[in-house]
């Protein structure tokens, strides 16, 4: 059986504030009983937070079947990460200017540069010569680049209001990435 995940990412978070932001978001989720306060072995590879008694309040479909799964928690990421869908093959990397697919272009160097925080994370479109950071190109399926993210394992579909509430707590727009491992 595979595990599904929903990654909620702030692409505009300052790298220097990610730990404090993580604590602020955790406090918000714990106070509303969306997650439990105690860290447990409920995510893939790292400790996470199990669903709290009020987790159904943020889900579109009122279903707690995932509670029986070993992997069913929240993972908080506070380091530079590319959030992607895992199981789906990358179909396209589109220029934000002309929408031309750049997947055949050598973009892995730009990705490595972004990870290493160098200034050479640029891709130049082979169609219109538009040049920008790899983070500005449009990925299919959707990818997000950030220093702060929440990964909910096997929770299902969230209510839009939950995303709106998180944007207020985080202080930036968020990007949502759905995936499967």
Residue positions per predicted region:
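Residues immediately within or flanking Cys/His clusters that coordinate Zn2+
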Residues: 90-92, 122-125
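Acyl-donor (CoA/ACP) binding surface of acyl/acetyltransferases
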Residues: 92, 100, 115
């Amino acid at each position: 059986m595979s595990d599904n995940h929903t990654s909620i990412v702030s692409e505009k978070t300052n790298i220097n504030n990610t730990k404090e932001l993580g604590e602020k978001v955790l406090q918000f989720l714990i106070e509303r009983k969306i997650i439990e306060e105690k860290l447990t072995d409920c995510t893939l590879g790292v400790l996470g937070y199990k669903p709290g008694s009020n987790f159904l309040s943020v889900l579109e479909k009122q279903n707690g079947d995932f509670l029986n799964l070993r992997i069913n928690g929240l993972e908080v990421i506070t380091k530079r990460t590319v959030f992607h869908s895992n199981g789906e093959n990358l179909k396209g990397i589109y220029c934000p200017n002309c929408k031309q697919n750049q997947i055949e272009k050598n973009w892995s160097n730009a990705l490595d540069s972004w990870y290493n925080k160098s200034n050479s994370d640029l891709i130049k479109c082979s169609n219109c010569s538009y040049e920008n950071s790899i983070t500005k190109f449009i990925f299919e399926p959707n990818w997000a680049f950030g220093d702060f993210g929440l990964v909910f394992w096997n929770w299902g579909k969230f209510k839009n209001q939950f995303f709106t509430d998180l944007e207020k707590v985080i202080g930036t727009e968020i990007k949502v990435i759905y995936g499967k491992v």
